[in-house]
Amino acid sequence: MKKGQLFIGALTCLVASMSWGAMFPVADHALEFVDPFYFSFIRYGVVTIMLVILLLVREGKKSFHLEGKAKWIILFGVMAFTIYNVLIFLGQRLMGKSGIMTASIAEALMPMLSIVILWGYKHVKPKKYTMISILIAFLGASMVITKGNISFFFSLGDHLFSILFIFIGVLGWVVYTMGGQIFREWSTLRYSTLTCLFGTAITGIMTAILTAQGYVSVPSIKVIAAIKYDFLFMITLPGIIALLSWNYGIKILSSINGILFINFVPITTLLIMVIKGYNITAFDIVGTLFVIIGLILNNIYQRKEDYKQVLQKEKTNLTIT
């Protein structure tokens, strides 16, 4: 793989991760006015319309053919745009202000979950350096959020269902990220659009049923107007831009390497909290360094392995000739 491609892949994953890190503080304000179901449906309803128009213009009607992969498109769409987007914000809302950082640090679990899934389902044993890098990055993220206070984890028992919702949501996004590898022959735009279309449609159906049962209510125009800037941000940067950037980056780097960048989600959330008056501690600084070191180590070892493969191919070609 060319260095330029690796850089672009890393940059797009970083943009997506930092965008998602910024979304939790913004969502905290929006969720005071609207429930997670309508919040997710309205947000990705607009994103879906934008993606459909963009795909139609760039690739034409033929790109909407599912090519016998409907079940996978629906599965991954539900995982990302129903399970992840609804449950992670539901958990955040139920936890209150503490949900901002809890939902954010939960994202740092994604690399570990992806490795477990690959190891258990596909029997793909990760490289030793990848596992070490992930552990270092996760340790750093944990230090940033907990400030070294172990009791933080024990106090989470008071919010068992909230944590469970967030965890299931995160697991949904891991499955979606890994699912992109099945559609490598498709463009990033096509995979993003079709999964978003079906996932959001199912979220809409579920929201309509809950509304009919009286569990949630349709937000008024006045409510939407009160959080219009929240929606504008959520639809653009953590929405369509982050979605396309993430899927493109994962396509280049692979899910197991690209998902390491998700550790920048809690770091970004923390930086925003700092802007709001949060005091920086030694754990914040050391934890941030751990995350960066974890990413750099993985990148260095990956480059060495790629270089060895290139040398091996050259030796093989010389032997044949």
UniProtKB/Swiss-Prot annotation:
The keyword Nucleotide-binding does not apply. The chain crosses the membrane at residues 6-26, 37-57, 72-92, 100-120, 134-154, 160-180, 196-216, 223-243, 255-275, 277-297. It is a multi-pass membrane protein. The keyword Chaperone does not apply. It holds the Pfam family EamA. It is found in: Cell membrane. Its main location: membrane. GO terms for cellular component: plasma membrane. Residues 18-146, 175-300 form the EamA domain. Disulfide bonds: none annotated. Keywords: Cell membrane, Membrane, Repeat, Transmembrane, Transmembrane helix, Transport. Belongs to the EamA transporter family. This is Uncharacterized transporter YrdR. The gene is yrdR.
